[in-house]
Amino acid sequence: MATTHAQGHQPVLGNDTLREHYDYVGKLAGRLRDPPEGGTLITTILFLVTCSFIVLENLMVLIAIWKNNKFHNRMYFFIGNLALCDLLAGIAYKVNILMSGRKTFSLSPTVWFLREGSMFVALGASTCSLLAIAIERHLTMIKMRPYDANKKHRVFLLIGMCWLIAFSLGALPILGWNCLENFPDCSTILPLYSKKYIAFLISIFTAILVTIVILYARIYCLVKSSSRRVANHNSERSMALLRTVVIVVSVFIACWSPLFILFLIDVACRAKECSILFKSQWFIMLAVLNSAMNPVIYTLASKEMRRAFFRLVCGCLVKGKGTQASPMQPALDPSRSKSSSSNNSSHSPKVKEDLPRVATSSCIIDKNRSFQNGVLCK
């Protein structure tokens, strides 16, 4: 009967394989609604706006690190890589939302695996990046050496390994580890994914997070028990970064733990038995919000990053105001030339030297304007 139903609605449903799997786990009716699964237009717009905000703020982090030479060191390379992961997570989830609902059934299984796999690649890269940061901090604390800017090979090696592991984990379903034509093994949250694959991913990510916690606990013990002060190698900056990263890891665990628990429930439950699995979009959104919180943590916890952010924003504002104020400059110049025309032509060099002072004094006189004649008043 299900087959007859599918044949009668082939132009609407599109792919039989996807329809059969969604029907088996009980998500077919929800996906035929736009927005899917009981969502409203407001929540869909909210999710899309959140994803756009995630992309924008993480792009600002990358630009700030790229433009500021102080951030061209190991730790900020890792933070930049984490920002790149968060940026890609925002893009991947936005694409996922736009391709959901009825559009799901117009996808081939390969495109479906790419759509869902991109989220797992971003998650894997984020988790591995946090592990790489913990490894780097641990090695630095053990050696107690100043940072050598010329030795960056370890940084890029760790970052490369992060992405290699992430792509490998995300590609497993499309390479064959899935539940196509094996319905009892299908996940309810991701109907083409094998429950064994999801259990494997959760175990991998949990092991990574436990390793991260152990490494930071060891770093803390090294700092407390060491007779040498960390001030011997730029400690203020180092400890500020350490606090920032610990906060990032804590927020990561808080945001992703509910989704991990939901996946474990998915592995344990049979199809259509656990109603909470049909509300997975809220758990996924909480996990994606982690990508929006990381740049906020960088800004609040690091003075250097906060200054870089403000410079970046103020620089854009100054450029925008400068282009608007530039047409007024020719109108002001003749007044100066008239006042200077009463003097002898022999005094013209002196007039040129005094011009910057006039611009500065006009800044001081008019305190109500922060930008005047192309000059930024402080």
Swiss-Prot record:
Sites bearing Phosphoserine, chain numbering: S326
Gene Ontology BP annotations: adenylate cyclase-inhibiting G protein-coupled receptor signaling pathway; inflammatory response; negative regulation of establishment of endothelial barrier; Notch signaling pathway; regulation of interleukin-1 beta production
Claim: Glycoprotein is one of the keywords in the record: yes
Residues that span the membrane, as ranges: 45-65, 75-95, 116-136, 155-175, 197-217, 245-265, 282-302
Keyword hit for Chaperone: no
Family annotation (SUPFAM superfamilies): Family A G protein-coupled receptor-like
Coiled-coil zones: none
Keywords carried by this UniProt record: Cell membrane, G-protein coupled receptor, Glycoprotein, Membrane, Phosphoprotein, Receptor, Transducer, Transmembrane, Transmembrane helix
Pfam families: 7tm_1
Cytoplasmic compartment residues: 66-74, 137-154, 218-244, 303-378
Tissues of expression: Most abundant in heart, lung, kidney and spleen; low but detectable in brain, thymus, muscle and testis; and nearly undetectable in liver, stomach, and intestine. Expressed in embryonic lung from embryonic day 14-18. Also abundantly detected in embryonic nasal cartilage, sphenoid bone, vena cava, Meckel's cartilage/incisor teeth, genital tubercle and bladder.
Family: Belongs to the G-protein coupled receptor 1 family.
GO molecular function, one term: integrin binding
Region named Disordered: 323-354
Function: Receptor for the lysosphingolipid sphingosine 1-phosphate (S1P). S1P is a bioactive lysophospholipid that elicits diverse physiological effect on most types of cells and tissues.
Domain of life of the source: Eukaryota
GO CC field: plasma membrane; presynapse
Cited InterPro entries: EDG3_rcpt, GPCR_Rhodpsn, GPCR_Rhodpsn_7TM, S1P_rcpt
Comp. bias regions, Low complexity: 337-348
Extracellular-side segments: 1-44, 96-115, 176-196, 266-281
Glycosylation sites: N15
Designated gene of the protein: S1pr3
Protein name: Sphingosine 1-phosphate receptor 3
Topological relation to the membrane, as annotated: Multi-pass membrane protein
Localization per Swiss-Prot or TrEMBL: Cell membrane
